[in-house]
């Protein structure tokens, strides 16, 4: 029963992240929604590992690996965002046409 509740929570977090990713115009909100998606996937991975093979630690290790990759991605994205803000004085996604 608890597996179903956690899967519902995880799918709600994933859908909330996708909705925010599609509708948001602010780069910081987009990064937060992307992290929300990563955390929903991470929650699924850890809970499936716990319920199907509780003696294996590989799911928890993959979870830690995903957290480390997400932290590195967020740091790089925030550094790029800071550099773009210094040039454009805005963090709205529709105003970024530097790459064209």
From Swiss-Prot:
What PANTHER family does the record point to? NADH-UBIQUINONE OXIDOREDUCTASE CHAIN 4L, NADH-UBIQUINONE OXIDOREDUCTASE SUBUNIT ND4L
Subcellular location, record wording: Plastid, Chloroplast thylakoid membrane
Residues spanning the membrane: 2-22, 28-48, 61-81
Which reaction equation describes what this protein catalyses? a plastoquinone + NADH + (n+1) H(+)(in) = a plastoquinol + NAD(+) + n H(+)(out); a plastoquinone + NADPH + (n+1) H(+)(in) = a plastoquinol + NADP(+) + n H(+)(out)
Q: Main localization of the protein?
A: plastid
Q: What does the protein in this record do? A: NDH shuttles electrons from NAD(P)H:plastoquinone, via FMN and iron-sulfur (Fe-S) centers, to quinones in the photosynthetic chain and possibly in a chloroplast respiratory chain. The immediate electron acceptor for the enzyme in this species is believed to be plastoquinone. Couples the redox reaction to proton translocation, and thus conserves the redox energy in a proton gradient.
- Read off the Pfam families from this record: Oxidored_q2
Record-level GO cellular component terms: chloroplast thylakoid membrane; NADH dehydrogenase complex
Q: What's a Gene Ontology MF term here?
A: quinone binding
The subunit field of the Swiss-Prot or TrEMBL record says: NDH is composed of at least 16 different subunits, 5 of which are encoded in the nucleus.
Give the domain of life: Eukaryota
What family is this protein classified in?
Belongs to the complex I subunit 4L family.
Give the EC class as a word: translocase
**Keyword list, A-Z:** Chloroplast, Membrane, NAD, NADP, Plastid, Plastoquinone, Quinone, Thylakoid, Translocase, Transmembrane, Transmembrane helix, Transport
What this protein is called in its record is NAD(P)H-quinone oxidoreductase subunit 4L, chloroplastic
Q: Which organism is it from?
A: Chara vulgaris
Query: Mind telling me which HAMAP family this protein's record contains?
Result: NDH1_NuoK
Q: What is its EC number?
A: 7.1.1.-
Please give a single GO biological process term from the UniProt record: ATP synthesis coupled electron transport
């Amino acid at each position: 029963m608890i597996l179903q509740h956690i899967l519902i929570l995880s799918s709600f977090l994933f859908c909330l992240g996708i909705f925010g990713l599609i509708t948001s115009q602010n780069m910081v909100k987009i990064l937060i929604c992307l992290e929300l998606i990563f955390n929903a996937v991470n929650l699924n991975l850890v809970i499936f590992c716990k319920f199907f093979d509780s003696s294996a630690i590989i799911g928890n290790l993959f979870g830690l690996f995903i957290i480390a990759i997400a932290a590195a991605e967020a740091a790089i994205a925030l550094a790029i965002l800071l550099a773009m803000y210094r040039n454009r004085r805005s963090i709205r996604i529709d105003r970024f046409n530097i790459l064209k």
